[in-house]
Amino acid sequence: MDMRTTEQQYNPYRVFTRQQWAELRNDTPMTLEPGEFSKLRSMHDRLDLQEVEEIYLPLSRLLSMYVDAAQRLYYAQRQFLGIRDRKMPYIIGVAGSVSVGKSTTARVLQALLTRWSPRPKVDLITTDGFLYPNAVLERQGLMQKKGFPESYDLPRLLAFLSDIKAGRHPVRAPVYSHLSYDIVPNQWTEIDQPDILIVEGVNVLQTGPLPRDGKAVPVVSDFFDFSVYIDAEEAVLRRWYVKRFLSLRDTAFHDPRSYFNRYALLSDEEATATAIAIWERTNLANLEDNILPTRPRATLILKKGADHEIETVALRRL
């Protein structure tokens, strides 16, 4: 038997080249203006008309079908059970490594989905707000593992998602500041009955150990209806991270309020060495141990090349 045929037969994903995926756009209209691209794009990420047309419009079309099917199934179940539950929002998870461009993908999806007809309410949160405050991380010796699963207040995040799925409103999420690198005290983002909620974070597809007694232990992805994993080779991610670090050294790090202000006066050589050290000590370990192993759990995998362009799309078979 041809090994390639065997691998394809048992592959849980259908894999598309960029050209093949672009053809699935069909007649989905472009609803974004060119001037919006720079506002949606993260630092050094790629987002232009071609990327939206060839990657995100087909994805928007697919998601519209998934959301419609989920709504019909929900109403069928409600009719079968003879109950009148509150309407549940459709939740989309966006996962991937640091510096891969999760925020760009999440913002583009929010912008496109908001423009569907009729206009749904689409909210976006990041799991950064559910990190433990720095004081807690320092007390527990976890500052060097910030972003690892153990650095998140998982019970709080699960309670938040449970309330969202149950239709409770409004539901509050803590606010995180990338400037201070910490939770902002007494500030909240309110999520009030969205039709669609996008949840973005490095570890949103993470699972925990299964209990031996068989009791149900919820994980974040249990609340997702659809999930996207943004993928790239480790060497590429490392290069993007170093490039972003150098750019921040020249911009945000100069703010006296910045947690990383101490890096603002580093030379190019010093900044590069510092970025590589941080990558290898923290981000690479998190990628290899906690993030990359969750990739097979995604509904859709977007694989990027060295120029940030999405090269292949893998869609999980039904």
Swiss-Prot record:
This is Pantothenate kinase. Keywords: ATP-binding, Coenzyme A biosynthesis, Cytoplasm, Kinase, Nucleotide-binding, Transferase. InterPro entries: P-loop_NTPase, PanK, PRK/URK. ATP binds at G96, S97, V98, S99, V100, G101, K102, S103. It comes from Bradyrhizobium sp. (strain ORS 278). Transmembrane segments: none annotated. SUPFAM superfamilies: P-loop containing nucleoside triphosphate hydrolases. It catalyses: (R)-pantothenate + ATP = (R)-4'-phosphopantothenate + ADP + H(+). Pathway: Cofactor biosynthesis; coenzyme A biosynthesis; CoA from (R)-pantothenate: step 1/5. Its main location: cytoplasm.
